[in-house]
Design a protein with these regions (language model features):
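Short, solvent-exposed loop/beta-turn-alpha elements that line the ligand-binding surface or hinge
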Residues: 107-133
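Positively charged n-region of N-terminal signal peptides that target proteins for export
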Residues: 1-4
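N-terminal secretory/targeting leader peptides
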Residues: 22-112, 138-369
């Protein structure tokens, strides 16, 4: 009898604990096949549950609830609790944070780039204020591998590119594309497949893993290897301030730590998926093209021209102390290039990012109104 009573008590205690667990409603937003839906967010919530002893958990609705171009207001208004905020979609709201996108031509290692972005924004008071104004708390960034031209038309020379409509993910890429003679067009990543298939766009300025991540195999016929820039202007696991305010300081720290696991999985996925996507693409008949020397030279000259004028451009956009901030980001990128040199796994990178960035953040004041 005592054994039965004890068992019932244990079960009841477990039910009560489960009922009291707070649940985060996330929207990874890029569809069920995207790495954040398949691995990133699940890893985050598994780690969060572990670190908080079950006090917090969560689930992801990868599509259908909120699109990437709606995420800013969705987080602010409580439609969802967590999701990715793409700075170029809301450039007026993220003038200071968006500086990282303007500097996306710097660096080649996406592990170092993403970590430099994360540390820059997390330690930038003006940046954190931007998120707070929109009812959000910033918890880090990832970054893609190098960008190429994924197209429906063959692009080998500048004359091939001239006049084509190329989807870009922000002002930096639009500048490069326009200077090279094409017409930049702008719409969410979730609409790329339809735009290429219908002829609204002739190409997208994206990384090779996007062939898999957003299933472009049946829309793209050519990949021109230009290796210019990455996409680093996104906060992939932004949390609603409503949720953050409910968390204890210990749980806030756990949340920041768990979020790194989602982002570093994405970082390594970009690296791992590049080779896989290229292999599948070639099997499907997609042609990979090395552009001619004139194309390469023009691209390099435009990149250098862009970087020479970036401080002035940022100042005109409203970034305060732009020169000092550019120098700060460059220093962080150099620091992280050294730190990641011997990192071999996503978990190792997640813990390194937590140690170097989030363990040093004052969780009492971070993200506060």
């Amino acid at each position: 009898m005592k054994k039965i009573v004890m068992t019932a008590a244990i079960l009841a205690f477990g039910v009560i604990n489960y009922a009291q667990a707070d649940t985060i409603r996330a929207t990874s937003a890029f569809g069920p096949k995207h790495v954040m839906a398949q691995a990133g967010y699940p890893a985050l919530f598994k780690k969060l549950k572990e670190l908080t002893d079950g006090r917090w958990t969560g689930y992801d609705t990868p599509s259908g609830l909120v699109g990437p171009n709606e995420m800013n207001s969705a987080l602010r208004e409580g439609i969802t609790d967590m999701g990715p905020v793409m700075f170029p979609y809301f450039s007026a709201d993220y003038v200071e944070s968006g500086i990282v996108g303007d500097l996306s031509m710097l660096g080649t290692d996406n592990r170092a780039i993403a970590s430099a972005v994360s540390e820059y924004i997390a330690t930038c008071p003006e940046c954190i204020k931007e998120f707070s104004k929109n009812g959000q708390v910033y918890l880090g960034s990832d970054a893609t591998t190098a960008y190429q031209l994924l197209s429906t038309k063959r692009i080998e020379s500048l004359s091939d590119l001239k006049g084509l409509r190329v989807r870009t993910g922000g002002a930096t890429y639009s500048y490069i594309i326009e200077k090279m003679g094409a017409l930049p067009v702008y719409f969410p990543a979730s609409e790329i497949f339809e735009a290429l298939s219908s002829g609204v766009a002739d190409a997208t300025y994206s990384s090779i893993p996007d062939l898999k991540n957003i299933q472009l195999y049946d829309a793209v016929k050519y990949v021109t290897l230009i290796d210019k820039g990455v996409f680093n202007a996104a906060a992939m696991t932004n949390l609603s301030q409503r949720v953050w305010d409910k968390m204890s300081l210990e749980d806030r720290s756990s949340m920041a730590r768990a979020a790194q696991y989602a982002q570093t999985i994405a970082i390594y996925s970009w690296r791992d998926t590049a080779a896989e996507a290229e292999k599948i693409a070639k099997e499907k008949g997609i042609e990979f093209i090395q552009p001619d020397k004139e194309f390469v030279k023009r691209g390099n000259n435009i990149r250098d021209e862009y970087m020479a004028g970036v401080t002035e451009a940022l100042t005109k956009k409203g970034v305060t102390n732009a020169a000092a901030k550019v120098d700060s980001y460059k220093a962080l990128l150099k620091k992280w290039e050294g730190l990641v040199a011997n990192v071999t796994t996503s978990d190792e990178l997640a813990e390194l990012r937590y140690k170097e960035i989030w363990s040093k953040v004052d969780m009492k004041t971070y993200g506060s109104h």
